[in-house]
Amino acid sequence: MKRCCEGVGLPCLFKGVGMASSRPPKYLLVFDFDGTIINESSDDSIVRAAPGQALPEHIRQSFREGFYNEYMQRVLAYMGDQGVKMGDFKAVYENIPLSPGMPDLFQFLSKNHELFEIILISDANMFGIECKLRAAGFYSLFRKIFSNPSSFDKRGYFTLGPYHSHKCLDCPANTCKRKILTEYLAERAQEEVEFERVFYVGDGANDFCPSVTLTSADVAFPRKGYPMHQMTQEMEKKQPGTFQATVVPWESATEVARYLQELLKKKC
């Protein structure tokens, strides 16, 4: 199946994971992080490292809809002022629980890695994602990770930046996952890698935006009862047939693994 879309050259973390086979993978598998790979929002989780495991009212009241990245910059600055260091953040990230069944799904993908190219698109941050994936032992599964840049400055403060700018009216100002996904597919097409199918595993409203671009050959895996699932249901009710991808809701990621396993059996 040939895919064509405009825009290339999106900056990202390239991990250079080698495939066992010289043939390119058949399928692209896209993961979200917060509420998908992990069972929490990592931005909420890190508050456990703050004094009293809580934020002051003036920080919490500073949140503006659509500008969550800016809000988190203020949260991290406050935590830096309170003496929270890299090791404190790292410990929290490493101990965030994975979503139900996620280890099973990752084990399945590890055994079938030559068939799947796996990327992660998240509105969290690079440091937190790397900490958790390394601790869980699944970091090497991902070819590329797209997320907000983060680092520790000379003071030891945890700093966060926006991923990019975009013109999408449906997404937060710092990240549009649809833009990231379409540019990634275009980049891979220029490298003569065309995927038979795209699978998207997510939970949030910002995962709905890229899933709308999926074709009838693709599969969207929204977490059952979460915003992405609710929005696909609403679109199907109001505009039947507009959402083209097959929708497979999940409560446990084991269900995603079973679906993919059945797909591979049919292909054999």
From Swiss-Prot:
It is found in: Extracellular vesicle. It comes from the Eukaryota. GO terms for biological process: bone mineralization; bone mineralization involved in bone maturation; regulation of bone mineralization. Its EC number is 3.1.3.75. Substrate binds at residues 43, 123. Mg(2+) binds at residues 32, 34, 203. The keyword Translocase does not apply. Its main location: other. One of its GO terms (cellular component) is extracellular matrix. It catalyses: phosphoethanolamine + H2O = ethanolamine + phosphate; phosphocholine + H2O = choline + phosphate. Its cofactor is Mg(2+). InterPro entries: HAD-like_sf, HAD_hydro_PyrdxlP_Pase-like, HAD_sf, Pase_PHOSPHO-typ. Keywords: Hydrolase, Magnesium, Metal-binding, Mineral balance. The active site is at 32 (nucleophile), 34 (proton donor). Expressed at sites of mineralization in bone and cartilage. Highly expressed in hypertrophic chondrocytes compared to non-chondrogenic tissues. Expressed in chondrocytes but not in heart, liver, lung, kidney, spleen, muscle, adipose tissues not duodenum. In diaphyseal cortical bone, it is expressed in the osteoid layer of the periosteum, forming surfaces of growing osteons, and newly formed osteocytes, whereas it is not expressed in the endosteum and closed osteons. In growth plate cartilage, it is limited to the early hypertrophic chondrocytes and the ossification groove of Ranvier. It is an enzyme of class 3 (hydrolase). GO terms for molecular function: metal ion binding; phosphatase activity; phosphocholine phosphatase activity; phosphoethanolamine phosphatase activity. Induction: Up-regulated 5-fold during chondrocyte terminal differentiation. Belongs to the HAD-like hydrolase superfamily. PHOSPHO family. Phosphatase that has a high activity toward phosphoethanolamine (PEA) and phosphocholine (PCho). Involved in the generation of inorganic phosphate for bone mineralization. PANTHER family: PHOSPHATASE, ORPHAN 1, 2, PHOSPHOETHANOLAMINE_PHOSPHOCHOLINE PHOSPHATASE. This is Phosphoethanolamine/phosphocholine phosphatase. It comes from Gallus gallus. The lineage of its organism: Eukaryota, Metazoa, Chordata, Craniata, Vertebrata.
